[in-house]
Design a protein with these regions (language model features):
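C-terminal extracytoplasmic interaction modules
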Residues: 1-111, 123-133, 138-221, 272, ...
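Solvent-exposed beta-hairpin/edge-strand motifs
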Residues: 217-231
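Surface-exposed interaction regions enriched in Ser/Thr/Asp/Glu
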Residues: 228-302
Length: 542
């Protein structure tokens, strides 16, 4: 299967094929009877049983924090008495189905899955009446969780003593939580996470006591950290020790009690002088793209790794610094903590789910195709240009970031402004106060928005961003998205144009709209029964 339809494939018929796991077998249904290669040396017989399809649309749900869902109504006839099979115990509800596209001459392994899921609310009648249902594919709709480890002080103490470096002393009987640490919370300048005092042991070589604090429930890249007592702000810089406890690699801070400059604290806060989690694919996990890829790997979703890796590269400028100290539902965390902060939407493609990265700074040179209605009369506008999101305009945005567990508050803020008067009173560009580091960022599109619509304010909080450069990137893409209303319009094209996919950039020349190479984003692609495709285009404003 190619990543895109080729012109050779699009010059022939694109067939729809429904495969259904039911009653102990696999059924293959199309809109005509054909026999194809299965890709392994055998053949597959596709029966003429796919009666009707509707809403064959691939949509990129841009800037949505909801999980993507694709639902396709289908009507089919298996050629058998379904009512009798149901009474024999073969339940239609919930059986797995795949609707795929197949080009002339391709074998089954080259098909392009359009939707894979279970039949929802199927309807059936007598023999010959067929079955009606919807195939629904949900992404990140499960309750899979990111789990943090709970460590008993006695287990950690035993593991340390087993190394021969330490001897028994005292330790609490309570358990402690070993958090997940991503990147450098606090950006290496302020406290970014919490540690937990676990035990005190003697160093065998010196006979002197050392205190041990659990930093993370995994190996980290940092070799030293700074601990601080949140009550009196005394600090100490300690080495980081990796020790395995019950099969879990823990990162532990080792405090020399004879030289420490910190007064004892059961839960000190941590300033990270290096990175956190080491990604299993290599390197320190510290960018938004790497973080999203990591979270997707924790799910049971089929992931398009090729497109996910491309997204990782596109998001290198967005650094992540955060920690989790309680189990969290992955889907909820992605929706609530990540998707509002980075220019990403989750999308579903033939190879699985992937993060689509919106190119907010794209230009006409990034377009993959040019629609010119004056040169190609087969390209036709379908309907009127529509304004959207006029009620969601924001041109003055306050971003609170760099969560500090010591103060239990955000340590920094940055403003995106189009009008200097919309800045907080009494503060200058780049100024600061005793409680928050404040700075400002602007874009001409914000000034345009203020001039047209007046000041529209919003405050956004994020616990996953710790550095100012990433904060500026967040303001940049959100300003380009929400400062102005967005316009959408549909164009219908012959099938030969169907290689263009949702997420692509195109330019449009249409004298009726006074457009000359207007840059647009392809939001959706709909396949019509006559072989044409309809594209919904979103104008990139600004």
């Amino acid at each position: 299967m190619t990543d895109r339809w080729t012109l050779s494939q699009l010059s022939g018929t694109i067939r729809w094929v429904l495969s259904l796991e039911y009653a102990g077998g696999t059924w293959y249904l199309g809109q005509e009877s054909i026999t194809i290669d299965d890709g392994t040396g055998g053949t597959i017989v596709i029966s003429d049983g796919l009666l009707d399809l509707a809403d064959m649309t691939e949509t990129l749900d841009l800037w949505s924090t909801d999980s993507p869902r694709r639902s396709v109504p289908v009507e089919f006839d298996l050629g058998v008495d379904v009512a009798a099979l149901v009474e024999e115990g073969h339940d239609l509800a919930g059986c797995v189905a795949e609707l795929a596209q197949l080009a002339d001459g391709d074998d089954w392994s080259a098909r392009r899955p359009f939707v894979v899921g279970r039949l929802q609310e199927p309807q059936y009648g007598a023999d010959g009446e067929g079955v009606r249902a919807s195939i629904e594919q949900d992404v990140l709709s499960s309750d899979e969780t990111i789990d943090v480890s709970t460590i008993y002080a006695s287990d950690l103490s035993s593991a340390l003593i087993a190394t021969g470096v330490y001897a028994a002393a005292t330790f609490p009987t309570a358990d402690v939580v070993a958090p997940l640490v991503i990147g450098a919370p606090g950006d290496g300048t302020v406290a970014g996470s919490k540690a937990a005092y676990t035990c005190t042991l003697f160093v065998v070589a010196t006979g002197l006591p050392a205190r041990f604090y659990v930093l993370a429930g995994h190996a980290v890249a940092a070799t030293t950290v700074t601990l601080a007592n949140p009550s009196d702000a005394t600090t100490v810089t300690t080495p980081v020790l990796i020790v395995t406890v019950n099969g879990i690699a823990l990162s532990v801070a080792v405090e020399d009690t004879t030289t420490t400059t910190m007064t004892p604290a059961p839960v000190p806060v941590v300033t990270w002088l290096g990175g956190g989690l080491i990604d299993e694919t290599g390197g320190v996990l510290e960018t938004a793209g790497d973080f999203i890829a990591y979270l997707l790997r924790l799910t049971e979703q089929q992931v398009d790794h090729g497109r996910t890796n491309a997204a990782r590269e596109a998001l290198r400028a967005f650094r992540v610094g955060t920690y989790l100290d309680e189990s969290t539902v992955i889907a909820d965390y992605i929706r609530e903590a990540v998707l509002d902060i980075v220019p990403v939407s989750l999308a579903v493609g033939p190879r699985g789910v992937y993060p689509y990265v919106w190119r907010w700074d794209a230009t006409a040179t990034d377009a993959v195709a040019h629609f010119d209605v004056t040169e190609d009369p087969d390209i036709e506008r379908d309907g009127l240009v529509t304004y959207e999101d006029g009620d969601r305009i924001v041109n003055t945005l306050q971003l609170l970031y760099q969560w500090n567990p010591q103060t239990e508050a955000y340590g920094a803020e940055i403003w995106a402004v189009g009008d200097p008067a919309s800045r907080p009173r009494g503060l200058r560009f780049g100024g600061s106060t005793a409680t928050l580091t404040r700075s400002y960022w602007t874009d001409p599109v914000l000034a345009t928005s203020v001039g047209r619509y007046g000041i529209r304010r919003e405050t956004l909080e994020t616990a996953i961003v710790a550095d100012v450069l990433t904060a500026e990137h967040v303001l940049a893409w959100r300003s380009r998205r929400w400062a102005l209303p967005s316009r959408v319009v549909d164009y219908t094209c012959p099938q030969r144009w169907a290689w263009i996919e949702p997420g692509d950039l195109v330019t449009v020349t249409d004298p009726d709209l006074a457009w000359s190479e207007r840059l647009c984003l392809v939001q959706s692609r709909a396949w019509a029964s006559d072989g044409s495709v309809r594209y919904t285009l979103r104008v990139l404003e600004g």
